[in-house]
Curated annotation (Swiss-Prot):
It comes from Rattus norvegicus (Rat). There is a cross-link at residue 133 (Glycyl lysine isopeptide (Lys-Gly) (interchain with G-Cter in SUMO2)). Its main location: cytoplasm. The lineage of its organism: Eukaryota, Metazoa, Chordata, Craniata, Vertebrata. SUPFAM superfamilies: Myosin rod fragments. Self-associates. Associates with microtubules and forms a fibrillar structure partially linked to the microtubule network. Interacts through its C-terminus with PLK1. Interacts with ODF1. Interacts with MARK4; the interaction is required for localization of ODF2 to centrioles. Interacts with TSSK4. Interacts with AKNA. Interacts with QRICH2. Interacts with CFAP58. Interacts with BBOF1. Interacts with CCDC38. Interacts with CCDC42. This is Outer dense fiber protein 2.
């Protein structure tokens, strides 16, 4: 193996559920010396700490007697192309240690190449899905742009409708004004006649009032004269009293007649005001009715326009919904493809992780089997050594019994250790059998999972066939749509050519119409200028009429004031007359107080005369104002008649010109609307044709790309399924072969263990029989020794008795060989 001092150690800590792929360069075949060196190094080499998803139960390996504990000694597994060293982890840190040079295989390289291919294919599918998502986003953006365009169009339509309503309102106002002017012109003649009649009535009433006022003034003058005479004459006669009473009665009559004339004048003025108010109310009512009729017509027209716009909006919404449905189907297909891809990826990763785990577990089982083989070989060597030692012991037993006793005790201890080790081995074998059963159950679970995966693969294949059928149906629908669009294109091209011919013909007929229209515009401008002049004249006349009306209202107010003052004067006069009557009736006897009363009456008469003079002046001013107003009204009536005649003539001309202009405008509007509609229809159809062509090209490209992607995905899926099947079958075969090998090895180890147990039992029996023989021999030798000692003692006693105690006996005892042969105490 290579020198690993140059490369530093690499420690990787990963979660338990994440699979780890380790790529390591392949090493040359290791030599025996290098393997021994690497075995001695242990944890000092370049190692990788990999936390596996499945924790392996780490046990302390069995150590033969006479060696130290191998808790931190690594296990080694060698193969001609590979080498693997594993240091069992401590109980505190369950971390498996692997060498970087022990996991490099050609299968891993091929698997990683396949994984890279799968990743590339997945990236291509992700790119395709991203393209589809971007296209869906583009379609969403186009839909949002279309919605915004529709909203802008709606706002423009609302603005246009508002402008149309304003223009229509202005037109209605202008029409109402023109109609009012016409009605005023029609009603002026009747009003003139009615005014003349009212003027005559008012003049007659005013003359009557003036006459009554003059008569009252004469009566007042007569009263003044009589009062003056009474002043000069201190005594009143019966004639004077009669004249006073007559004059008073005449005054009362004149005042009553004046009151009646004033009442009639007030009634006439009230009737006139009521008539004017009723006429105004009728005019306002007619105008309101006309406005209501026009508003109803405009409302109906706007409702029709709104219905048309609602229909267009509904059609556009239906198109948008169709596009949304298509986008939803596309997004659902993309989501299903993504989910299928993710599911397949997850399954592939899970299966690869399970395969890697199974490979690691199989390698661990092989290592444990190799360890068991090494331990069995060590046990066999130990048994051979024990046999050799037994032979040696047999040879040495003959030489020294005491040494055999000590060795027998040692051998008994060693036999006890062997019994303990055999019990441990039995436990280890039972654990190995339990692990084998667990591996068999796991293998059965893997087989079941494989069956489930095969069922899922069948379901996925069915789903792929369904998707292919759906794609074929979509392609057929797209072909049908494309054929229908091509037919529409042909129709629209034919209609476009017809519209072009009609447009050229209309353009040819449009030039003379433009000349006529320019002439009509000039005439309309002239008429508008004349109409503006007439409108200015009419406004001036209206202002003058309003001024005269205001002046008439002021005069009527002044007349009402005069009436009120006259009433007040009449009331005061009545009160004074009644007081005078009472005074005359009560104070006829008291003639002494007449001068005071006369003075008071003279003062009151002077005040009344002053008031009458003021009223006369006011009457004169009012008559002058009324005469001025009459002259102004007559002059304005003449002007109004002239203006009416001119206006009627201008109206006739305006009507004729407006009829001509309306006809020309209608024709122009019809032609312009037709041209605009034709141009819009042509532009829309060209845009629709262009968009349809672009959509056809895009959809054909999308269909082609999707078909290619589906074919490639289906082929890749089939290849992957076949490869996974082949890999699973090969792995199953390898696992079955390994399991069979392990079972054969277990059976061999079991037979070897049975043989070892039998040999051990035989050895124990032989050893015990030999021990019994040795014990028997020892007892025999002891008995012979005792008998010999007894015999020697007998001889001693006999020699002592025969020869007596002397030096001869002592020397004889020291030199006797039997004494030397006896074992030391």
């Amino acid at each position: 193996m290579k020198d690993r001092s140059s490369t530093p150690p690499l420690h990787v800590h990963v979660d338990e559920n994440t699979p780890v792929h380790v790529h390591i360069k392949k090493l040359p075949k290791p030599s025996a010396a290098s393997s021994q060196k690497s075995h001695k190094r242990g944890m000092k080499g370049d190692t990788v700490n990999v936390r596996r998803s499945v924790r392996v139960k780490t046990k302390v390996p069995w150590m033969p007697p006479g060696k130290s504990s191998a808790r931190h000694v690594g296990c080694k597994w060698e193969n001609p192309p590979h080498c693997l060293e594993i240091t069992p982890p401590s109980s505190e840190k369950l971390v498996s240690v692997m060498r970087l040079s022990d996991l490099s295989t050609e299968d891993d390289d091929s698997g990683h190449c396949k994984m890279n291919r799968y990743d590339k294919k997945i990236d291509s599918l992700m790119n395709a899905v991203g393209c589809l998502k971007s296209e869906v986003k583009m379609q969403k953006g186009e839909r949002q742009m279309a919605k915004r365009f529709l909203e802008e169009r709606k706002e423009e339509l609302e603005e246009v409708a508002h402008e149309l309503a304003e223009t229509e309102h202005e037109n209605t106002v202008l029409r109402h004004n023109i109609e009012r002017i016409k009605e005023e012109k029609d009603f002026t003649m009747l009003q003139k006649k009615h005014l003349q009649q009212e003027k005559e009535c008012l003049m007659s009433k005013l003359v009557e009032a003036e006459m009554d006022g003059a008569a009252a003034a004469k009566q007042v003058m007569a009263l003044k004269d009589t009062i003056g005479k009474l002043k000069t004459e201190k005594q009143m006669t019966c004639t004077d009293i009669n004249t006073l009473t007559r004059q008073k009665e005449l005054l009362l009559q004149k005042l009553s007649t004046f009151e009646e004339t004033n009442r009639t004048l007030r009634d006439l003025l009230r009737e006139q005001h009521c008539k004017e108010d009723s006429e105004r109310l009728m005019e306002q009512q007619g105008a309101l009715l006309k406005r209501l009729a026009e508003a109803d017509s405009e409302k109906a027209r706007l409702l029709l326009l709104l219905q048309d716009k609602d229909k267009e909006v509904e059609e556009l919404l239906q198109e948008i919904q169709c596009e949304k449905a298509q986008a939803k189907t596309a997004s659902e297909l993309s989501k299903s493809m993504e989910s299928m891809r993710g599911h397949l990826q997850a399954q592939l990763r899970c299966k690869e992780a399970e395969n890697s785990r199974l490979c690691m577990q199989i390698k661990n089982l092989e290592r444990s089997g190799n360890q068991h083989k090494a331990e069995v070989e060590a046990i066999m060597e130990q048994l051979k050594e024990l046999k050799q030692k037994g032979d040696r012991d047999k040879e040495t037993l003959k030489k020294a019994i005491r040494a055999q006793k000590e060795r027998a005790e040692k051998s008994e201890e060693y036999a006890e250790q062997l019994h303990v080790q055999l019990a441990d081995k039995d436990l280890y074998v039972a654990e190995a059998l339990s692990t084998l059963e667990s591996w068999r159950s796991r293998y059965n679970q893997v087989v079941k999972d494989k069956g489930d995966l095969e069922l899922e693969i069948i379901v996925l294949n069915d789903r792929v066939t369904d998707l292919v059928n759906q794609q074929q149906s979509l392609e057929e629908k797209m072909r049908e749509d494309r054929d229908s669009l091509v037919e529409r294109l042909h129709r629209q091209t034919a209609e476009y050519s017809a519209f072009k011919l009609e447009n050229e013909r209309l353009k040819a007929s449009f030039a003379p119409m433009e000349d006529k229209l320019n002439q009509a515009h000039l005439e309309v401008q002239q008429l508008k200028a004349s109409v503006k002049n007439y409108e200015g004249m009419i406004d001036n006349y209206k202002s003058q009429v309003m001024k005269t009306r205001l002046e008439a209202d002021e005069v009527a107010a002044q007349l009402e004031r005069c009436d009120k003052e006259n009433k007040m004067l009449k009331d005061e006069m009545n009160k004074e007359i009644e007081a005078a009557r009472r005074q005359f009736q009560s104070q006829l006897a008291d003639l002494q107080q007449l001068p005071d009363i006369l003075k008071i009456t003279e003062a009151k008469l002077a005040e009344c005369q002053d008031q009458l003079q003021g009223y006369e002046r006011k009457n004169i001013d009012l008559t002058a104002i009324i005469s001025d107003l009459r002259s102004r009204i007559e002059h304005q009536g003449d002007k109004l008649e002239l203006a009416r005649e001119k206006h009627q003539a201008s109206q006739k001309e305006n009507k004729q010109l407006s009829q001509k202009v309306d006809e020309l405008e209608r024709k122009l509007e019809a032609t312009s609307t037709q041209n605009v509609e034709f141009l819009q229809v042509i532009a829309k159809r060209e845009e629709a044709i262009h968009q349809a062509q672009l959509r056809l090209e895009e959809k054909t490209r999308e269909c082609g790309s999707l078909a290619r992607q589906l074919e490639s995905a289906i082929e890749d899926a089939r290849r992957q399924v076949e490869q996974t099947k082949e890999q699973a079958l090969s792995k199953e075969r390898a696992a079955q072969s390994k399991i069979l090998d392990l079972e054969t090895q277990l059976s061999r180890t079991k037979t070897e263990l049975g043989q070892l147990r039998r040999t051990r039992d035989d050895v124990d029996r032989r050893y015990q029989s030999r021990l019994q023989d040795l014990k028997d021999r020892l007892e025999q030798s002891e008995s012979t020794n005792r008998s010999m000692q007894n015999y020697v003692q007998f001889l001693k006693s006999s020699y002592a008795n025969v020869f007596g105690d002397g030096p001869y006996t002592s020397s004889y005892l020291t030199s006797s060989p039997i004494r030397s042969r006896s074992p030391p105490a």
